[in-house]
A protein has these predicted regions:
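GIY-YIG nuclease catalytic motif and its immediate N-terminal context
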Residues: 1-50, 63, 70-86, 103
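Cytochrome P450 catalytic domain signature, combining two hallmark sequence patches
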Residues: 54-60
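Generic low-complexity segments that are intrinsically disordered, proline-rich and/or Lys/Arg-biased
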Residues: 22, 58, 91-92
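Coupling/hinge elements of helicase-like and P-loop NTPase modules
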Residues: 90-103
Length: 103
């Protein structure tokens, strides 16, 4: 199942501050090739801004140019992240085959 809020936003600080809430949820980073990373956090806005400031661990897969997110409770977000990793198989999350066994 894709992101419930699938509207892709530009992966820039101004867009993150304007669009991403400081709330619990799951987020995805994308580029022209597709989804490159899916994460979960208790503060979507802060985590996305932190990704901008960190060295780019996704360099081999291309820099992120967009993001999307969906709100979810702390109890739901880890399961939702795993579900999305299995579905999208983003290269930044490593090999999703081990997660497929859990479903």
């Amino acid at each position: 199942m894709p992101f419930r809020n699938c509207f892709a936003r530009t992966f820039k600080a101004a867009a993150i501050r304007r669009e991403a809430p400081p709330s619990s949820g799951v987020y995805g980073l994308s580029n022209a090739r597709g989804w490159i990373y899916v994460g979960e956090t208790d503060d979507i806005q802060a985590r996305l801004l932190a990704h901008l400031e960190e060295p780019n661990p996704f360099a081999a897969h291309g820099a992120p140019t967009g993001f999307s997110f969906e709100l979810s409770s702390p109890g739901e977000r880890i399961a939702r992240q795993r579900q999305m990793i299995v579905e999208f198989d983003p290269p930044g999350n490593g090999d999703s085959r081990s997660m497929r066994k859990a479903f």
